[in-house]
Curated annotation (Swiss-Prot):
GO terms for molecular function: transferase activity; zinc ion binding. A zinc finger (RING-type) spans 131-173. GO terms for biological process: protein ubiquitination. It holds the Pfam family zf-RING_2. It is an enzyme of class 2 (transferase). CDD domains: RING-H2_EL5-like. This is RING-H2 finger protein ATL78. SUPFAM superfamilies: RING/U-box (SSF57850). The lineage of its organism: Eukaryota, Viridiplantae, Streptophyta, Embryophyta, Tracheophyta.
């Protein structure tokens, strides 16, 4: 028994023992290293959603502020325009016709405008082949109303509706206020002349005196 044990110990080399010790220590270090390393947590998907929601809220707030500012500016401009229109204008000023461009034309003046029946043979300087308001062509024997001064022609219904809220020609923007005032003045003077009764005329005839002469009485 003693001989066999001594032989087995003598046969083992010291290099093999050293390698076994290194291998066991390396395996222990590797085991400890794997236990120490913990898996890194994956990024949460809620972080991206929160960023997206914040951007959407910011954009919506900016749009809302812009809308409120535009509405406020629009209301301020309207108030300023209304206040400027309410300012009384001088009757003899140069801007008097311009301020009254949107007051419309009276019906009496509209009735005094010339109305013709359209035909292709009409050679009027301001008459076109279509109405500038409804953009439809004139038909033969159709009633067309001509505006004074510019002589532009339109359908009777179209121009009456237009001039109920405007005082200018829809084609050339010529102001009709002064023309309508002249027409109204002429109509008033003519009506006064027609209603005024004729005055009785008294004719005095003065005969010349006869020359004086002596009258002799004969018996």
């Amino acid at each position: 028994m003693c001989t066999t044990i001594s032989i087995s110990i003598s046969t083992i080399k010291p290099t093999e023992i050293f390698q076994e010790i290194l291998g066991s220590s390396y395996s222990r270090k590797l085991l400890f290293h794997t236990h120490d390393q913990s898996p890194t947590p994956a990024p949460s998907p809620y972080v991206g959603d929160n960023n997206f929601d914040a951007n959407v809220v910011m954009v919506l707030s900016v749009l809302l502020c812009a809308l409120v500012c535009s509405l406020g500016l629009n209301s301020i401009i309207r108030c300023a325009l209304r206040c400027s229109n309410l300012v009384p204008s001088e009757a003899g000023g140069d801007n008097y016709p311009v301020r009254l461009t949107n007051t419309g034309v009276k019906r009496k003046a509209l009735k005094s405008f010339q109305t013709v029946s359209y035909s292709t043979e009409l050679n009027l300087p301001g008459l076109d082949t279509e109405c500038a308001i409804c953009l439809s062509e004139f038909v033969a024997e159709e009633r067309v109303k001509l505006l004074p001064t510019c002589h532009h022609g339109f359908h009777v219904r179209c121009i009456d509706k237009w001039l109920s809220s405007h005082s200018s020609c829809p084609t050339c923007r010529h102001c009709l206020i002064q023309t309508c005032e002249k027409i109204a003045d002429c109509s008033q003077t003519s009506s006064l002349n027609s209603t005024q009764p004729p005055q009785d005329s008294i004719i005095l005839q003065i005969a010349p005196l006869e020359p004086e002469r002596w009258i002799r009485w004969f018996r």
